[in-house]
Each structure stands twice: as structure tokens, then as C-alpha cells.
């Protein structure tokens, strides 16, 4: 899932506050 307070974009968290990372997170969720 996506946690916007996390500034990471890895296979564990799949998220960060960067737009590209958010999109990546949403598609790979």
C-alpha cells in the first residue's frame, strides 16, 4: 500500500512523496 509520509520507493514500501513514485506505487500496488 501507499504511505505518503515515507520518502522511499523500494519493493517493500513502494512509495514516496514524489509524483513518479506515487504513480509507480499505485500501479504496482
Curated annotation (Swiss-Prot):
Its domain of life reads: Eukaryota
- TM helices/strands, residue ranges: none
Question: What tissue specificity does the UniProt entry give?
Answer: Expressed by the venom gland.
- Gene Ontology cellular component annotations, sorted alphabetically: extracellular region
Q: Does the keyword Transcription apply?
A: no
- Here the disulfide bonds are 2-16, 9-21, 15-25
Any one Pfam family match given in the protein's UniProt record, by short name: Toxin_12
Which UniProt keywords are present, listed alphabetically?
Answer: Calcium-activated potassium channel impairing toxin, Disulfide bond, Ion channel impairing toxin, Neurotoxin, Potassium channel impairing toxin, Secreted, Toxin
* Entries under InterPro entries matching the protein: Huwentoxin-1
Principal location class: secreted
**Which locations, inside or outside the cell, does it occupy?**
Secreted
The coiled-coil segments of this chain are: none
Q: Name one GO molecular function term.
A: ion channel inhibitor activity
Give the family, as the similarity comment puts it: Belongs to the neurotoxin 30 (phrixotoxin) family.
Record's miscellaneous remark: Negative results: At concentrations up to 330 nM, does not show activity on transient 'A-type' Kv, delayed-rectifier Kv, voltage-gated sodium channel (Nav) and both HVA and M-LVA Cav channels in cockroach DUM neurons.
The UniProt function text for this chain reads: Insect-selective neurotoxin that potently blocks insect calcium-activated potassium (BKCa) channels (Slo-type) in cockroach dorsal unpaired median (DUM) neurons (IC(50)=25.3 nM). This occurs in the absence of any shifts in the voltage dependence of activation. May interact with the turret and/or loop region of the external entrance to the channel and does not project deeply into the pore of the channel. In vivo, does not show toxicity in mice after intracerebroventricular injection of up to 25 pmol/g (1.8 ug/20 g mouse).
Notes on the domains: The presence of a 'disulfide through disulfide knot' structurally defines this protein as a knottin.
Protein's name according to its UniProt entry = Lambda-theraphotoxin-Ec2b
State the organism named in the record.
Eucratoscelus constrictus (African red-rump baboon spider)
